[in-house]
Regions:
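Terminal cytosolic tails of multi-pass membrane transporters
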Residues: 100-102, 164, 354-492
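Central hydrophobic cores of alpha-helical transmembrane segments
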Residues: 73, 77, 334-345, 390-392, ...
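Helix-loop-helix module between adjacent transmembrane segments
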Residues: 1-55, 125, 140-150, 242-250
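Membrane-water interface regions at transmembrane-helix termini and the short interhelical loops
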Residues: 14, 18, 48-70, 160-166, ...
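Hydrophobic alpha-helical segments embedded in the membrane of multi-pass proteins
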Residues: 44, 48, 309-322, 340, ...
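Loop-to-helix junctions at membrane interfaces in multi-pass transport proteins
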Residues: 23-41, 71-234, 384-406
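Transmembrane helix-loop junctions in multi-pass membrane proteins
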Residues: 4-25, 53-60, 191, 199-201, ...
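Loop-to-transmembrane helix boundary motifs in multi-pass membrane proteins
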Residues: 1, 32, 36-44, 260-300
Length: 492
């Protein structure tokens, strides 16, 4: 959570610096700020606004503003895609990219040579983890599988899942996120990619940025100010700020829920009044933002914290969150020591491993966290039988639950074990293809790759039909069976 907030702090600072030139703003600031800390000043200003917005608004306002902000973001995404398509013809794309760029296939190495077209990009890619593409994809796939097995991340994603009325609604909400978000997101991303091609190929952008030693992470706001008309630029800026506010608000709003409910009320002040809980939530929100802001001052760039979050921190927490669903013996001590060992190892790795290699150390982090989980689990007794049986009946999980399943069936003969593992794994495979198509379709649409667009749309339609019969219909049927079971055994 702190890592994500630091990521947003650095990003919003660099982004807004382009739109609000320091030469103009500095006239109204009563103190001198070194040039290298100007993005941090902007970051502090906008995160402070967002923090008060979260504290004063609460959960309901965050939900409704999320809806409004998404609509703004969708319009902005469509606009930027249209602008990019009007400025860059398909022939220009083919002239700009090197051989092999259009192919989805690759070997152990990426083998795409940008040296003749954009030598500075070749130098930048040497510092990224993508050269050994085969290993990178294997590590990313391995991490993705375990992240999926871990269920919703223990942040605002979990809050949104738990706020749904039923398992069916939770599943539909989770699935609809891909449909709603991916298409406008990648329309905007590919629109900016086309504008970048125009910038580098037609407007001599490489020479301009090299001459003034421009940070490549600020290309996006440069493109907006250079190619987007004034009125639309305002809309786009509002859309991107909306995306920041939405993510920032949801992340900050999750922190008080965990700290106040799981620590303050449980161990410090169980009888706290509602007013006291609200004040504690305000304090936690401010502390989380302050700590993440301080962390942001020690980061070199956005990519640095991004690589650490997706490669190291995720690797540190995944093991504990996988085991909590799939192993009956797992307990609170195992979760604590697994999370602690994983996060501590991730922090150590932050200072000992180059950022470009973090993802390759995912198995190491996962192994350290897994050992912490197992040692912590056997250092304490298992959860009480009532809790385990109740969890098994309500969740019906996969994995190593045989002793608990036997007790649940003995107590409630109507209960049956989850025997749909093969069907669910088939749905996972189809779902991966379906979600990839949702990503690829807007990309092919913007670059006008007719063959790829037709193929991906057809594949999207086929996988949607398959999921209707193998996922949605069983979901509806099993929802009714679940409700009837809960009534029969008196757990409704």
């Amino acid at each position: 959570m702190l890592g994500f907030l630091s990521y947003g702090f650095i990003g919003i600072g660099k982004f807004m610096e382009i739109f609000f030139p320091w030469e103009v703003v500095s006239q109204y600031v009563p103190w001198d700020i070194p040039v290298q800390y100007v993005p941090h000043f902007y970051g502090i200003f906008f995160t402070a606004i967002a923090t008060f917005y979260v504290m004063l608004g609460g959960m309901l306002s965050i939900v409704w503003t999320d809806v409004v902000q998404f609509l703004i973001m969708t319009v902005a995404g469509v606009v930027i895609a249209i602008i990019g398509m009007n400025m860059v013809a398909p022939e220009m794309i083919r002239e700009f990219v090197p051989a092999g760029w259009e192919s989805p296939f690759f070997g152990w190495t990426l083998d795409i040579d940008w040296s003749e077209r954009m030598s500075l990009l070749t130098e930048r890619m040497a510092d990224e983890p993508y050269s050994l593409m085969g290993v990178f994809v294997m590590m990313a796939l391995l991490k993705g599988i375990f992240m999926s097995m871990a269920g919703p991340a223990p942040n605002y994603d979990m809050q949104k899942i738990l706020s749904c009325k039923s398992p069916k609604e939770a599943a539909l909400m989770s699935g609809s996120v891909s449909v709603i978000l991916l298409i406008p997101r990648y329309l905007m991303i590919m629109g900016f990619a086309l504008l970048a091609i125009y910038f580098f190929k037609v407007d001599g952008g490489l020479e301009q940025m090299t001459a003034v030693h421009t940070d490549f992470e600020t290309i996006l706001p440069h493109l907006i100010t250079k190619y987007v008309p004034v009125g639309l630029a305002g809309l786009l800026l509002a859309g991107l700020l909306s995306a920041f506010m939405s993510t920032f608000a949801s992340t900050v709003n999750a922190a008080p829920a965990y700290v106040v409910n799981d620590i303050y009320l449980k161990y410090i002040n169980p009888r706290a009044s509602v007013r006291t809980q609200i004040r504690a939530s305000y304090l936690v929100s401010v502390l989380v933002v302050v700590i993440s802001t301080v962390m942001g001052f020690f980061l070199k760039d956005i990519n640095e914290i991004f690589q650490w979050i997706v490669g190291a921190l995720f690797g540190g927490y995944i093991a504990a969150n996988v085991l909590k669903w799939h192993w009956w013996r797992f307990n609170g001590e195992g979760y604590f020591w697994g999370m602690t060992s994983g996060v501590v190892a991730a922090i150590v790795m932050k200072f000992t491993v180059p950022d470009s290699l973090v993802l390759y150390f995912f198995p190491v982090l996962f192994g350290i966290s897994l050992v912490g989980c197992i040692v912590g689990t056997y250092s304490a007794p298992p959860a009480d039988e009532e809790t385990l049986v109740n969890f098994y009946i309500r969740v019906c999980p996969w994995g190593w639950w045989k002793p608990v399943a036997a007790k649940a069936v003995a107590r409630y003969p109507q209960v049956t074990r989850n025997r749909h593992f093969k069907r669910d794994m088939f749905n996972v495979a189809i779902g991966i293809v379906w979600q990839c198509c949702l990503t690829i379709v807007p990309m092919y649409l913007v670059v006008r790759g007719t063959g790829g667009l037709i193929a991906s749309v057809l594949l999207l339609v086929v996988t949607t039909v398959v999921l209707k019969y193998t996922w949605y219909r069983p979901l509806c049927r099993e929802e009714k069976e679940y409700d009837e079971l809960m009534k029969r055994i008196g757990m409704n």
